[in-house]
Amino acid sequence: MRHGTHTGSNPYAEAYVEVTAGGLAETDLAADPIEQFRRWLADAIRYNLPEPTAMVVATADADGRPSSRHVLLKSVDDGFVFFTNYRSRKGRDLSENPSASLCFPWFAIGRQVVVLGTVTKVTREETEEYFASRPRDSQCGAWSSENQSSVVPSRAWLDERYAEVAQRFAGVEHIPPPPFWGGFRVIPETVEFWQARPARMHDRLRYRRTADGERPWIIERLSP
């Protein structure tokens, strides 16, 4: 159930909406965080949350300056996979500092998942397979934005670039991925599952990777 909990003149306080839901106990969790994530993602999809695979990807450059943006999760295996322009700010950050944090904000059902991990590029074969599944206009868009995150003169300039790319590939049945475009895989070191509870006494359970082959993950409860 969702309900407002603050009154007064502070607009930020007025905007706060509390979500009450069932608790989250250690015994509720799968032994592996990837399996637990799949369960919660299935719940987010079942509840028809908008863009349930949208996540905030936070990176930092070599000097520690952070940046963040929303990106769509494309697959989950031993890590969390997304695709982007390698020349974008996040691509440059990850080439200098291959660590990232992900946040899945499923606040409508009182949940969020926060991942911290190291980042590697996916294979070119994985990139080609995913790129082939994209709509043709999105493929052209990837080629059009050769220097993502750079300053451009105008919207008209962007539209002209797209038209040029679409014309270039007009007779090509299968558009290949650009050499500056591909995927990253975030290999988790910690994964926190956050469940909203009344009075801000939220449940926070974190998986932490260990060097123990027989017990690769430890589950810890964090103070709310």
Curated annotation (Swiss-Prot):
Keyword DNA-binding set for record: no
Entry EC no(s): 1.4.3.5
Cofactor: binding details: Binds 1 FMN per subunit.
MF (Gene Ontology): FMN binding; pyridoxamine phosphate oxidase activity
Cofactor(s) of this protein: FMN
Its biological purpose: Catalyzes the oxidation of either pyridoxine 5'-phosphate (PNP) or pyridoxamine 5'-phosphate (PMP) into pyridoxal 5'-phosphate (PLP).
Name recorded for this polypeptide: Pyridoxine/pyridoxamine 5'-phosphate oxidase
Species this chain originates from: Acidothermus cellulolyticus (strain ATCC 43068 / DSM 8971 / 11B)
Lineage: Bacteria, Bacillati, Actinomycetota, Actinomycetes, Acidothermales
Gene that this polypeptide is encoded by: pdxH
